[in-house]
Amino acid sequence: MRTYQVNVTRDDRWWMVAVPGLTGYVTSDGAINMSDTTQARRLSEVRRQAIDFICTVTDVAPSEVQVNITIDVDGIDVTAEAKKIAHNRELAKRHATAAQTEARDLARRLAKHGVAVRDVGDVLGVSFQRAQQLISA
């Protein structure tokens, strides 16, 4: 299995899909590939278009091809920023889970010490109904 770098840019209403590894590729019959670019109308089509293009030029099965896609729009490194956003969302999810666990634990401890449910809600910044749910969970 071979991994190809795929560089995607925007050109008017099209996504230009460049596969630098295909420039000058020599086929089994000696033909030289002169182009490294195809296009896609939608970003969701890029992976499939790139793999189809690579398979057509190299005459290999799609199962033998992997692609590493980078997207750049007028100097915006879309790939890097999207990865950063995904990472931050994952961190936020973990922090939210930890905060939920800590809130539940604190609510239970306060309730065991006789603190009123409404006061537990005030401490945690939630309604008394939510405080009761945390205590009961």
Language-model segments: what does each one mean?
Residues 1-66:
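DNA-contacting interfaces and partner/effector-binding or oligomerization modules
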Residues 6, 107-116:
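Short basic helix-loop element that most often maps to the first helix and adjoining turn
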Residues 62-81:
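Short, mixed-charge low-complexity intrinsically disordered segments
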Residues 111, 124, 135-136:
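DNA major-groove recognition helix of helix-turn-helix
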Residues 116-124, 131:
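Short alpha-helical "recognition helix" segments of helix-turn-helix
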